[in-house]
Amino acid sequence: MASLSWWNPAPATAAMAACSPTPTSCKTSNSLALPRSVFVSKQEELMKQAKSLLVKTQQQSKKKKNNSTNSRRTTSIQCLSQEQKWTHEGSITESLPNGMFRVKLDNADVVLGYISGKIRKNFIRLLPGDRVKIEVSRYDSSKGRIIYRLRGGREG
C-alpha cells in the first residue's frame, strides 16, 4: 500500500486527551460536578415515566377500539338500509350487456335489474325466462338488484 505523505496524523496521546471526559472532581464554570448515582437515578425515573405513559396510551387505544363498535348504532344503520328496499318477484325478459337484465315483475312493471355480488361470486347463470327475486329501491323503482334466482325452471 502506498504511503500518504500529505496525511500527518496527530499523536495518539493528544487525540486521547481531546476525547476524554473531564474528571468528576474538577469544577468548571459551565457545569456542576455531580456524583454518577444522581444521573443513574434520574435516568431510571425517566424510563419509568416513559413506560407508564406507553402503557396508558396502549390501554386508551384498547378502550377506543372496544367503544368504536356500538351495537345499537350499527343495528339502526342496518335497519335503515333494509327499510329502503322492496323485494319483488318477476321473470327475466331480456339479457343486456354487463350483467344487466330487463325484468318483468308480477305487478306488470318492467325494471332494469343488475346482478348482485353473491350471484356473480357463485357463477349463477341467468337466462331469459328465469324467475328471480329483485330488490328495488323506493326512491328509484326503475332499477333493481337481482338477489336470488328462484327454482322451478323457465317460463315458456
From Swiss-Prot:
Quaternary organization: Component of the 30S ribosomal translation pre-initiation complex which assembles on the 30S ribosome in the order IF-2 and IF-3, IF-1 and N-formylmethionyl-tRNA(fMet); mRNA recruitment can occur at any time during PIC assembly.
Residue span of the annotated presequence: 1-81
Skewed-composition ranges (Low complexity): 67-76
GO cellular component, one term: chloroplast
GO molecular function terms listed in the Swiss-Prot or TrEMBL record: ribosome binding; RNA binding; translation initiation factor activity
Entry's localization field: Plastid, Chloroplast
Organism: Solanum lycopersicum
The protein, known as: Translation initiation factor IF-1, chloroplastic
PANTHER family: TRANSLATION INITIATION FACTOR IF-1, CHLOROPLASTIC
Chain spans, region Disordered: 51-79
